[in-house]
Amino acid sequence: KQDDPAWAPIFEAYRPITAWLAAKRPDVLLFIHNDHVTSFFFDHYSAFTLGIGAEYAVADEGGGARALPPVRGHPALSAHLGAALMADEFDLSFFQHRPLDHGCFSPLSMMMPHDPWPAAIVPLQVGVLQFPIPTARRCYRLGQALRRAIESYPEDIGVAIVATGGLSHQVHGERAGFNNPAWDAQFLDLIESDPERLANMTHADYATRG
């Protein structure tokens, strides 16, 4: 779809990210994402779920798994992050032997080559599909705790943090197809210049804006 005018801007936007990762060559990508009821279901749905596996396969989301190889995990870093975050009062769930869906593999496949993948990943699944869900403030504090945890890891490795997902979008309901480009641009500015303002917003604030 790279030559399709409707899709081309997406691929174009990934090129600086691809170039940055190729230059920095991180050992591990900490992949913050949400599962789309592919491997995590509402009968046991956690706010924050950390992957601790040695490998993650591509999930079959109904039409067969994409032709991508599994990606390596980093169990040692996962164990350290899990212990550090629990000590920092984040009560996590943990998983292994569960495939990852397009929330991980779609951006990953556009950010780097896959034969083989040049970096391992540590996936962190955020449960945002079923209320109650974490507040923006809670997610901001988790990000701060993740930085402390990564910086305290004793091995000298490069870690890049990837946060996936769309900005404003509505995939079902009365506003299906809605997006808000002006809010998207403002959000991207604020996440760098004034994250406290974003952290103070409510779920209703975010839902209204998209």
Task: Set out the residue ranges of the language-model regions.
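Secretory-pathway/luminal and periplasmic proteins that interact with or process carbohydrate-rich
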Residues: H169-G173
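Catalytic metal-binding/acid-base residues of hydrolase active sites
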Residues: D35-V37, L167-S168
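Non-transmembrane, aqueous-exposed alpha-helical and coiled segments at domain scale
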Residues: Q144-V159
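Beta-strand elements within well-structured catalytic alpha/beta cores of enzymes
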Residues: D27-H33, L124, I157-G165
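Flexible, D/E/H-enriched segments
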Residues: K1-D27, S39-R141, S152, E174-G210
